[in-house]
Structure formats: C-alpha cells, structure tokens
Amino acid sequence: TPDGVVASDSDELEGRFPAGDANLCTSSLYYDALLSASMLGRELHKPAAQTAAYRREAAALREAIERHFGARVEGFDTYRYYEGNDRLRAWICIPLTVGIDTRSEETVRALFSPALWTENGLLTQSGDKTFWDRATLYALRGAYACGETGKTTDYRSFYPARRLLG
C-alpha cells in the first residue's frame, strides 16, 4: 500500500469479521517471512545483497506497521487491526509472536483485559461473543515471547482445564 503495509482483502478469519484493505496479521506475517527468508538465504549461501535486501524490507515494514496500525484502542496503546478499526481484536497478539514488541506491555494488558479475555479465552473482537482457541494460543505465545511470563502462566493454566478437559 502507499503506507508501506501489505494490502489484503481478507485474513485468516475469511470474512467472518471486518479486515479492511490491509490488516495487522497479514503485514506481521509478511514481516516475519522476510526475516525468515533472510536467515534461510544466509544458510543457503545466497548473495549477501539478496539477504540484506530482505532485512531492509523487513525493517521498513516494521516501521510501516507501527505507523499504520499503532493506535490507542479502547484505552490501550496497542494496534488497530485495520484502518478505521476502533475495537480491540484478538489478533493484536500477532506482532508479539514475530518479535515486534514496541507496544508489548499495553498489548498484553489489552489481551488479558475484560474487553477481550473470557472464561473461554480470547474474544475475536471486543463486544462480541465469538472466541477462537487459535487466537488464545497465539496470544499466550506472544505474551511469553515478549517476556510476560508470570501473568501469562496464570492465564495459560486455565486453558487445559477449561478448553481441553471441559
């Protein structure tokens, strides 16, 4: 897009919730893919210029993600899922899973807040009733990745008892 994020007309929720013309998840996953391509290229002895280009593109995308998606949403300095989005979404955890930790503290607070967290895990979107186990697991992974081990372990301990064992 002109803003430097990845354009996409859908996301992993396949139209069940709004995703805009560019969404946080797709851009974050592409960022991670660029870093992975750079590392793989080095392992495969690809030209240094090629792997450096992937790293530069990833760095530019990381900055674009912050500019385009970084926002105050429902009182948290976290990410909006797409331009114009004003509700917390579970997938604000995805940047954390790929090493984008600029807004990690507030994002973790938002994920574990009553706006998103329920007895069944994370709501897909605040104010809705839909929850998705995959989003909950990614949120736990992202929170662990940014060092929020104590709080995350407390929330993780509920998961097997509630969702796996009933």
Task: Describe each model-derived feature in a short phrase.
Residues A19-K46, A52, R56-A59, G70-G166:
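Active-site core of glycosidic bond-cleaving carbohydrate-active enzymes
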Residues A7-N23:
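Acidic/His metal-coordination segments adjacent to aromatic residues that form catalytic metal sites
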Residues A64-F69:
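Short amphipathic coiled-coil heptad-repeat segments
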